[in-house]
Amino acid sequence: TKLIKVNTLSYKTVSANKETVEKEWFVVDAKDVVLGRLASVVAMVLRGKHKPSFTPHVDCGDNVIIINADKIKMTGKKMTDKQYIRHSGYPGGQRTQTPEDLLSKKPEAVVERAIKGMLPKSRLGSEMFRNLFVYAADTHPHEAQQPKELDLNKIK
C-alpha cells in the first residue's frame, strides 16, 4: 500500500475572530423596495451569513448603509393598519403608532425596527445593529468608505 501525505490544516474548520474578520461596506437604495424583503437581506449581511467564514458567536457581518428610507414600500394595507406598540412601563402607558405616522416623524425608524427584529436578541445582536446606517435622504456621509452597491436579488 502506498502512504499518502495529507496537509492536515486543510481539514480544520476555520473559525473567525475579531482580528481575522474583514468587513466591507455596502449601500442599499430602499426606494420602492418592500420592507420585509429589504430587512431580511440586510439582516443576513449584518450577521455575515453570506460569507463562507460565518461564525455564529462572532460579529463577522458587513457594514450596511440604507438610503431613501422614507420611500420604502409595504404590501397590502400595512401602511395604515399595522400597529407598532410600545409601553412606558406605567399603568395605561401603552402607545401605538402606524408606519404612516412613524414615516412622517422619523422615517429611519421603520426600517431600523424591521431589521433589528431579525437580528439576534443578545449583546452580539446589538453589536451587529451598530453596523447599520439608515438615512431618509438619498445621500450619506460614508463616501470615504467607498461602499459597494448591494443587489438585493443576488444574495439569498
Pin down the residues of each PLM region.
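Ribosome large-subunit tunnel/peptidyl-transferase-proximal elements
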Residues: K2-R113, R123, P141-K156
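Hydrophobic, well-ordered secondary-structure segments
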Residues: V111-E112, K116, F129
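C-terminal structural segments of small proteins and small subunits
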Residues: S122-Y135
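Short, highly charged C-terminal tails/helix-capping segments
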Residues: V134-H142
